[in-house]
Structure formats: structure tokens, C-alpha cells
Amino acid sequence: MNLYGYFLLLIIVIAFIALLPLFSGIGTFKLTKPKSSATAQSATGKLGKREYLKKKLDHTNVLKFDLKDTEESLGHDSASASSASRKFEIDSKTGLKRRVIGQYNKDPNDFDFDIDDLINEDELDERREEEKKLKKYNGKKNEAYEGFV
């Protein structure tokens, strides 16, 4: 590939990355007309440094990206609706939120299953395997045991 091919590939990749939020429905791009810089310069004395820089940035950006509101997208988008319905616990030490998957019982004596049933199932499996081995050797125990050694 020559230089033009790489340049074209780069433009396609950048355009695809820029358009991904539009395809997924997260937000929209808006083109705005830049406002005159005279109004921004005259207000320099009244505004602080942070406000001045924020207004200057707003005036210079022609292409703006706006995220959709969560209230609007709850009814329309199933992905955001499922993420909004998740429950979180707040950790008391760090204050960070943690996703709640389920409440678990930490009592070691409380089981979800019956141990006797599991033991009986294992015994049945062992009997079935032994019967299969005996059928393989046609009920000849001595030959069956010799085959295992």
C-alpha cells in the first residue's frame, strides 16, 4: 500500500470512531456557529480566569457532542434501561458503589442441597459402573478382576 492508502484508511478509522456514539444512540453531534470573540474579550475583566477559559472554549468549538438525557433514553433504549435498574451498595469504608448480584447466606451449616441425596447418587453411579464392567466380561468375576490388574 502506498501513502495514500494509509491516509485513506486512517480517515475511515477516525470517522468510524467519531460516528460510533451516533450509531449506538448515546448522543448527537451539533454544528454551531462560532460567536464573535469581541464579546469574549470585553468580559475578561468581569470574569475569573476559569470562567473566561470556559467561555473561550465554548466560543471556539464549532462541533459539539451532546449526551442524551437518561430520562429520555429509559423508555427507548433497552441497554440504558437495564443499566439504570441495577442496584448498588455503598461501601462504608471507601464510599464507592458496589454492584449487588445477590445476597448469600454465610452459615456453613445451611446448605442448598441434601447431603444424603448426593451420597446416594454417588453410590448409584458406582453400582452402575460396576455392572457395566461385569457385563463387559459376561459375569466372569475372576476374569474381570484379572483384567483390572
Swiss-Prot record:
Keyword Membrane: yes
Gene: EXP1
Statement: the UniProt record of this protein carries the keyword Transmembrane: yes
Transmembrane regions: 7-27
Topology in membrane: Single-pass type I membrane protein
Protein name: ER export of PMA1 protein 1
Subunit structure, as described in the record: Interacts with PMA1 and PSG1.
Main subcellular location of this protein, as a coarse class: endoplasmic reticulum
Purpose: Specific cargo receptor protein for the plasma membrane ATPase PMA1 that acts with PSG1 to promote the transport and maturation of PMA1. EXP1 and PSG1 probably act sequentially to promote PMA1 sorting between the ER and the Golgi, with EXP1 promoting PMA1 export from the ER to the Golgi while PSG1 has a role in PMA1 maturation or quality control in the Golgi.
Reported consequences of knocking out the gene: Lead to ER retention of PMA1.
Lumenal side: 1-6
Organism: Saccharomyces cerevisiae (strain ATCC 204508 / S288c)
Residues in the Cytoplasmic compartment per record: 28-149
